[in-house]
Curated annotation (Swiss-Prot):
The gene is ubiA. The lineage of its organism: Bacteria, Pseudomonadati, Pseudomonadota, Betaproteobacteria, Burkholderiales. Pathway: Cofactor biosynthesis; ubiquinone biosynthesis. This is 4-hydroxybenzoate octaprenyltransferase. Keywords: Cell inner membrane, Cell membrane, Magnesium, Membrane, Transferase, Transmembrane, Transmembrane helix, Ubiquinone biosynthesis. It comes from Burkholderia multivorans (strain ATCC 17616 / 249). It is found in: Cell inner membrane.
Length: 287
């Protein structure tokens, strides 16, 4: 078992934390806004660990669902499950175990949060199979990656206000943007094996679609900033996020694999500076 532990870590992408961070930033945005800038530390820990666990569970389930496809893709052919180094039942067991631990984390929270966690689990568990049916499965991914938003509001306020759903919509568009960049890396392989992705659906308009999704995401956060009366610190963070989006355009406009992958990875900075702007606003407002 100990000898296989490094393989399990690779299965759940512990060596690639970018995915966890893409889940974490929107969740932290929601925690800070829901609590008016004063989230309780136990909640921060619960949601941070829950994000890590559920992303890891999602990776294991994704590899299980895609095990017959990944062997045909150069980038994924050496994954532990695809290469036969671990077995399918192990991936499923790990996904179930991590999901159970994540649920244990939220047991101290209110009933509404626990009810929403069931929905979140369903969405996360079914996403890997959506690539067979949906033309833009990245939209479904955005719901899965963003469900920490309504859960955060529920945990803090014991209700899910319209603002939470607006933030979730913003996350859906952001997810379409960054995961389309990711899909542009595997475009040729996905055509051969018949997987549906937004990069294939958008076709020659893929770059324009990515930038349009960034524009919608940032536009929603303009509305949020105005509606909540955020100050200059927030707008500095927003401007930095907009700058990241412009930088991504320079990377993806040539549609080359490595620059597109770099743009995907750089979304960590976009999410991070936007959260920094929100946190800085509340910090300065309370000083």
């Amino acid at each position: 078992m100990l000898a296989r532990f490094p393989l399990y870590l690779r299965l759940v992408r512990m060596d690639k934390p970018i995915g966890s961070l893409l889940l974490l930033w929107p969740t932290l945005n929601a925690l800070w806004i829901a609590s008016d800038g004063h989230p309780r530390w136990p909640l921060i820990v619960i949601f941070a660990l829950g994000t890590l666990l559920m992303r890891s569970a999602g990776c294991a389930m994704n590899d299980y669902a895609d095990r017959d496809f990944d062997r045909h893709v150069k980038r994924t052919a050496d994954r532990p499950l695809t290469s036969g180094k671990i077995r399918a039942w192990e991936a499923v067991a790990i996904a179930v175990g991590l999901s159970f631990v994540a649920f244990l984390l939220i047991l101290p929270l209110n009933t509404l949060t626990k009810e929403l966690s069931v929905v979140a689990l369903f969405v996360a568990g079914t996403y890997p199979f959506m690539k067979r049916f949906f033309a833009i499965p990245q939209a479904y991914l955005g719901i899965a990656f963003g469900f920490g938003i309504p859960m955060a509001f529920a945990a803090v306020q014991n209700t899910v206000p319209p603002l939470a759903w607006v933030m979730l919509i913003a996350n859906v568009f952001w997810s379409i943007a960054y995961d389309t960049e990711y899909a542009m890396v595997d475009r040729d392989d996905d055509i051969k094996i018949g997987i549906r992705t937004s990069a294939l659906t958008f076709g020659r308009f893929d770059v324009a679609a990515v930038m349009a999704c960034y524009a919608v995401t940032l536009g929603i956060y303009v509305w949020i900033g105005i509606a909540l009366g955020f100050g200059a610190a927030y707008w500095v963070g927003w401007a930095a996020a907009a700058g990241c989006a412009v930088y991504h355009y320079t990377l993806i406009k040539g549609r080359e694999r490595m620059p597109c992958f770099a743009a995907f990875r750089h979304n960590n900075w976009l999410g991070g500076v936007l959260f920094a702007g929100i946190a800085a606003h509340y910090l300065m407002a309370g000083s």
